[in-house]
Amino acid sequence: MDICLPIRDIYVRKILDSGGSPAVEAEVLAGEDIVGTASVAGQKGEQEIEAGIEQMHSQIAEELIGKNLFEQEEIDHLLEKRKEIPQEVSLAVSIATARAAAGKLKLSLYRYLGGTHALKLPALLILAADGTAEETEMDFRELMLVPKGISSVQGQIRAAGEIDSLFREALKKRNGREGEPDRKKQDAADGGVLKLLEKAVEEAGYQCGKEIFFAVNAGAGRLYEKQSGVYRFPAESRRCGQRVERSREELIEYLTRLTGEYPISLLEDPLYREDREGIQELEKKLEDREDCEKKTVLGRRSVMIDPGEIYTLTELSERVREVTEQGKGIILCRQRKETEDAALVDAAVAFGIGQMKLGSPGCLEAAVKYNRLLKLEEKLGKSLGTDCP
C-alpha cells in the first residue's frame, strides 16, 4: 500500500475476560488521532500475562513504533518472531494495528483485511451444552447446534435462542427429578442430553435433520486413561450409580449408534488423538451408512483452527490458505473465555472461513459476536459460507 502512516505508540493493559480471568487489551496509535483497540481472552496465567505486557512495552514496542501502520504483514511477522511473549498479547497488538489502519481508511475491518473478496458470512455452530457446566451433567465436552437448514444468520440466531431457552428449562426439570434411578439410568445410557436437545428443537418448531443438526465434541482425550486403555465416563457413572467405562470398540459402537439416533453432522475429538487406527475404523463405520454424506469426523474433510494458537492476523490468513489448498473446509473455534471483541468475526469473513463456533446467545460476550454478524448480514446479504460438516 502506497499510504504511509507511522505507528506513534503502543499500549497494552490487563483486563478481565468473561470468566473473570486476566485478558489483554491493546491500543495502537498513529498520526494525531488514529487509535486501534483490540482485546483477546487470556490463555496464560496472570504473572505470564503481566510479564508479556511489560516486555511489549519495554522491548517490542520500540521495534514497532515508526513502522508503517499499513504494513500489516511486516508488523505481524515481527510479532511472530517474538514467541516469548504470550499469544494473547501478540494477537491483540496485531488486531489493534489492523483496526487503526481500517479506521484511517474509514473501512470496516473485514473489508480492510479481505478487500472486495470478502463476500460471505461464516455458517454457524452454536453452543448448546458445555460439558464443564454442572447443570449439563454430561461427559462430552460440547454439544452444538448446526442450523445449516436455515438460510440466514438472523434466522440461525433466532432458532438458537428459542431452542436454548427450552433446552435450559428441560435441563432444570431433569436435574430436579428425585427418586427415579431407572429413568436416570435410561437418560444416561441413551444419550439423555442429546434427547433433551432434540426435544427442545422440535418444541421450538424446527425440524431435526432438515433445519437443525448437532455437532458433538466428545473430548475423548480427557476421558481416556492411558494406563488401562479405556474411556471413563464419570457423569454417566454418577447418573447410573455404577462405574461406566468403554473400550475403543465399545466407544466406536456408542458413537456410531448416537449418530444413527440423532442428526449429528460433525464428530470432533471422538477418540484418543493418537489412536489413528480407531479413528479410521470409526470413519469406515460412518462411511458404510446410507446417510454418510451427513457425517464427518473432524480432520477428514474439515479442520479446526483454534484462535488461542494464533499469534497474528497474518498467521491466521496463511493458515486458512494452507488448509483451503488441501481441499478441506475450515471451522474457526470459539474460546471458552471471551472478551467483548468481535474482530474474529470480521477476520472469518475477510479470509473466507466457512464455519465458526460461537458461544451461547445468552452470553454477553458471545452476543457481541452475533450482533456483529447481524450487521454484516445487512451489508453482505444472506450469503453464508460452506457447510463443512
Place the predicted regions along the sequence by residue.
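Short beta-strand elements
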Residues: K14, V24-E32, A38-V40, L125-P147, ...
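Mobile "lid/hinge" segments at catalytic clefts and subdomain interfaces of large enzymes
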Residues: L119-R183
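Short, Gly/Pro- and small/polar-rich lid/capping loops
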Residues: M1-V24
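Glycine/threonine-rich beta-strand-loop-alpha-helix active-site module
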Residues: L107-L125
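Metal- or metallocofactor-binding catalytic centers and their adjacent structured scaffolds
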Residues: A41-L107, I157
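Catalytic core of soluble alpha/beta enzymes
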Residues: K185-D187, G191-P389
